[in-house]
């Protein structure tokens, strides 16, 4: 049984095809659901909840970031929960939207010396946790969220993306 009902939109020709991205996202987000559910960190509905993923470019995500967050710049990932939810509480049937910008991800992979797939995996997990109410606005929240990211990524065979870094809090 699928862990999530994943809907994908590809708005930039630089991304792989929809089938490739869907398979990738099912593996990554499926692992996140299994870890969160089995570790009793997060309950999930019996029916697979829906998440919408948009794979776009820097110009599009910059427009969205300016409109919804008042930040007129491109960013790697934006998450828009469909409904307010607190971490560890049952989400609704529609989790929300995750939007990822290809050019920013590509630049960051060079800066971080990571593979594109590994960095994209991290951003998908990060965005997914935001849909479940997790955040990093203060050090306590950041510690919880980054700890979950690290453990989920470990389930996928990836190393700690925060190793040797300070907690990443929003300004």
UniProtKB/Swiss-Prot annotation:
It is an enzyme of class 3 (hydrolase). It comes from Rhizobium leguminosarum bv. trifolii (strain WSM2304). Gene3D superfamilies: Metalloproteases ('zincins'), catalytic domain (3.40.390.30). PROSITE patterns: UPF0054. InterPro entries: MetalPrtase_cat_dom_sf_prd (IPR023091), YbeY (IPR002036), YbeY_CS (IPR020549). HAMAP family: Endoribonucl_YbeY (MF_00009). This is Endoribonuclease YbeY. Belongs to the endoribonuclease YbeY family. Pfam families: YbeY (PF02130). Zn(2+) binds at residues 126, 130, 136. It is found in: Cytoplasm. GO terms for biological process: rRNA processing. Single strand-specific metallo-endoribonuclease involved in late-stage 70S ribosome quality control and in maturation of the 3' terminus of the 16S rRNA. GO terms for molecular function: metalloendopeptidase activity; RNA endonuclease activity; zinc ion binding. The gene is ybeY. Binds 1 zinc ion. One of its GO terms (cellular component) is cytoplasm. Its cofactor is Zn(2+). Its EC number is 3.1.-.-.
């Amino acid at each position: 049984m699928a862990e999530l009902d994943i809907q994908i939109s590809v708005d930039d020709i630089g991304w792989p095809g929809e089938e490739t991205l869907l398979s990738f996202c099912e593996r990554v987000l499926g692992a996140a659901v299994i870890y969160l559910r089995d570790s009793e960190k997060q309950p999930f509905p019996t029916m697979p909840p829906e998440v919408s993923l948009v794979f776009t470019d820097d110009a599009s995500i910059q427009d969205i970031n300016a409109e919804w967050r008042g930040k007129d710049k491109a960013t790697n990932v934006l998450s828009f929960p469909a409904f307010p939810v607190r971490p560890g509480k049952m989400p609704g049937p529609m989790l929300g939207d995750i939007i990822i910008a290809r050019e920013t991800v590509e630049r960051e992979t060079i800066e971080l010396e990571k593979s594109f797939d590994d960095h994209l995996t991290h951003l998908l997990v990060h965005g997914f946790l935001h849909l479940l109410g997790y955040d990093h606005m203060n050090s306590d929240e950041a510690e919880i969220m980054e700890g979950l990211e690290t453990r989920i990524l470990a389930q996928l065979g990836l190393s700690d993306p925060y190793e040797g870094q300070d907690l990443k809090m929003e300004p």
